[in-house]
């Protein structure tokens, strides 16, 4: 039986986790949620926790101090976050942080491959894990992979403030479906993509670029207002 497998940078806890669990449990099909547990440890062997919850399985693991410093605080927080929040003047990038970013995405993929089954549908959440599908596919994974941007997609001028922007765009093409919250965001992405690689529009809303075929979709994100107050 196929599952929905959600891979996210960091898992929530407490009330948020319970709420998310109820949402997953309401689905007819089982699921798997994989991500960083929020802990940072300085041990060579870092345990991977596997738990069964109502309606889905949960796989979590800690980061090393170096992973947290270079990936989370470095490339993501000091680099990608300012660009994706329209504050490029605050962005700081180094080759070492980018290397850690790619390496940690490979680690996410390594752990995911140990738990994925044929037919599982993989959904990856946001820009901390942009290259994750590439790491999965390069290990031979054949499962369908989707990626969702919950933030506005940056303009080409903003994106070019990232030294590795071309590599990041190329890594997105390993996804079978790329989701956005608005049509404007999708159009901005396609405009940025066409500036880097030739595009070919195929039947059934498929797109071909840099040797990959993928689709895009619009999935407006919202909240349950009753849970706010």
Language-model segments: what does each one mean?
Residues 1-229:
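Catalytic cores of carbohydrate-active enzymes across secretory and cytosolic contexts
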